[in-house]
Amino acid sequence: MSAVTRCEDGLVLRLYIQPKASRDSIVGLHGDEVKVAITAPPVDGQANSHLIKFLGKQFRVAKSQIVIEKGELGRHKQVKIIHPQQIPPEIAALTE
């Protein structure tokens, strides 16, 4: 399975999360996953909620349109983005 997969109602992303980074960014490929750096620490779900907020801004969707399908408690996650309004260039390059 690739890092970015199109499905009928949006995109499925396989992510590797780097918490406690200096800034929020989509770093690029990390093996067969997309590496995302976020500033939040991995404590009490702070990293997950920060990740959802960050992805919501990047894809211009509401937070309710982003679902963590797998990896709620780990660094390796599978996230579904329902009907993205915009696709960031870092992700668009991987879908081709």
UniProtKB/Swiss-Prot annotation:
Record's GO cellular component terms: cytoplasm
Pfam families xref list: DUF167 (PF02594)
Family under the similarity heading: Belongs to the UPF0235 family.
Protein name as catalogued: UPF0235 protein YggU
Upper lineage: Bacteria, Pseudomonadati, Pseudomonadota, Gammaproteobacteria, Enterobacterales
